[in-house]
């Protein structure tokens, strides 16, 4: 793709998200979503092949359906309130339809089926944009409508997402699918706390984006897309492989790593609101996520796949890539937990 055209497309994606996050007019928010969706499709098809074509088509159909539901909710809200402003409280019907539309855009269960398929069909760089940047706009709208959102519906989808994210990641050998199911589970944690403490949901989003970005950047450096290629990284970049596995455990929520921080704070916040059953179920389901990450770490680090002798000296001939920006990302992705007492100020 021409670098100038690619830059313009990236700017359009950013502009669409910025419009959604800053506007207080429902039509402008819808336009922002459409700009973002149409601009991100060429990024998904950056490497043109049948798989990326199929992934882009699935993404377009899902997002177009979500946009249609969103516009339906906006029109119903206009009929009831007579205003386009996002500051006005939503009616119950509008709230349910809008929650479903945003759940479809975020990839919450039961609207999650497109996330693993699309992520698996695109390049690692496109998958990074899909699982990080594309979550910002829907989450900002959820944040704004959180006071009038349907609590029961959102909690049900949150529990389903955490369960699906845990079950789906089991027996996966493709790293992009593992990251996609991890994304579904993390979205479930964020939406579970959205009504009780929206600021904490945003904190969870920031930590999730940080962890996912670091993981994808390190996978891109070695073009690793399967557990087999990840295990061969020991011969090329042993320190980087150790960092990847540590951050994957952080994504699974293993204490004392950074990924444990939002889970701990969310469970604490839910129990403060006299909601005991929900955090108990969420904590048990989160063990599924941690299990497949620990199994991935075990199979990669403690068991060696068969390899030829010349693979064992591959690190001597590997091309050195710049890693200056990875150091702060790795530190933040593993060592945020000691800062969590300061995060209590969010409450």
Swiss-Prot record:
Family statement drawn from the similarity comment of this UniProt entry: Belongs to the complex I subunit 2 family.
A Gene Ontology cellular-component term: mitochondrial inner membrane
Record InterPro entries: Complex_I_Subunit_2 (IPR050175), NADH_DH_su2_C (IPR010933), NADH_UbQ_OxRdtase_chain2 (IPR003917), ND/Mrp_TM (IPR001750)
Keyword set, alphabetical order: Electron transport, Membrane, Mitochondrion, Mitochondrion inner membrane, NAD, Respiratory chain, Translocase, Transmembrane, Transmembrane helix, Transport, Ubiquinone
Keyword NAD in annotation: yes
Membrane topology: Multi-pass membrane protein
The protein's enzyme class: translocase
GO biological process per UniProt: mitochondrial electron transport, NADH to ubiquinone; mitochondrial respiratory chain complex I assembly
Broad class of where this protein is predominantly found: mitochondrion
GO MF term list: NADH dehydrogenase (ubiquinone) activity
Role played: Core subunit of the mitochondrial membrane respiratory chain NADH dehydrogenase (Complex I) which catalyzes electron transfer from NADH through the respiratory chain, using ubiquinone as an electron acceptor. Essential for the catalytic activity and assembly of complex I.
Top-rank taxon, per record: Eukaryota
Compartments where located: Mitochondrion inner membrane
One Pfam family from the record: NADH_dehy_S2_C
Transmembrane segments: 3-23, 25-45, 59-79, 96-116, 122-142, 149-169, 178-198, 200-220, 240-260, 276-296, 326-346
Assembly: Core subunit of respiratory chain NADH dehydrogenase (Complex I) which is composed of 45 different subunits. Interacts with TMEM242.
Protein name: NADH-ubiquinone oxidoreductase chain 2
Native organism: Nyctimene albiventer (Common tube-nosed fruit bat)
Reactions catalysed: a ubiquinone + NADH + 5 H(+)(in) = a ubiquinol + NAD(+) + 4 H(+)(out)
PANTHER family to which the protein is assigned, alphabetical: NADH-UBIQUINONE OXIDOREDUCTASE CHAIN 2 (PTHR46552:SF1)
EC number from the UniProt entry: 7.1.1.2
């Amino acid at each position: 793709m021409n670098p100038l055209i690619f830059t313009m497309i990236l700017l359009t994606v950013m502009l669409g998200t910025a419009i959604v996050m800053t506007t207080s007019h429902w039509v402008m928010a819808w336009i922002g979503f459409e700009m973002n969706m149409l601009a991100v499709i060429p990024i998904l098809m950056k490497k043109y092949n049948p798989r990326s074509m199929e992934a882009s088509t699935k993404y377009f159909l899902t997002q177009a359906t979500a946009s249609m539901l969103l516009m339906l909710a906006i029109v119903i809200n206009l009929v009831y309130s007579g205003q386009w402003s996002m500051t006005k409280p939503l009616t119950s019907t509008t709230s349910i339809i809008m929650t479903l539309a945003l759940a479809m855009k975020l990839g919450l269960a039961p609207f999650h089926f497109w996330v693993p398929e699309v992520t698996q069909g695109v390049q690692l760089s496109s998958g990074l944009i899909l699982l990080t940047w594309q979550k910002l706009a829907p989450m900002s709208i959820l944040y704004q409508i959180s006071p009038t959102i349907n609590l029961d519906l959102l909690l049900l989808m949150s529990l389903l997402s955490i369960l699906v994210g845990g079950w789906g990641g089991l027996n996966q050998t493709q790293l992009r699918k593992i990251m996609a199911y991890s994304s579904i589970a993390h979205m479930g944690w964020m939406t579970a706390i959205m009504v009780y403490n929206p600021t904490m949901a945003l904190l969870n989003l920031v930590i999730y984006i940080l962890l996912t970005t670091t993981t994808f950047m390190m996978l891109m450096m070695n073009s690793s897309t399967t557990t087999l290629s990840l295990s061969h990284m020991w011969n090329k970049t042993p320190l980087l492989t150790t960092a990847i596995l540590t951050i994957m455990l952080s994504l699974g929520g293993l204490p004392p790593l950074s990924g444990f921080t939002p889970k701990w704070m969310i469970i604490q916040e839910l129990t403060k609101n006299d909601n005991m059953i929900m955090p108990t179920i969420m904590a048990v389901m989160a063990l599924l996520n941690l299990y497949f990450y620990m199994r991935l770490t075990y199979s990669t680090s403690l068991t060696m796949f068969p390899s030829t002798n010349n693979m064992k000296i591959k690190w001597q001939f590997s091309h050195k890539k710049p890693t200056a920006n990875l150091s702060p990302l790795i530190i933040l992705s593993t060592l945020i937990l000691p800062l969590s007492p300061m995060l209590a100020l969010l409450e």
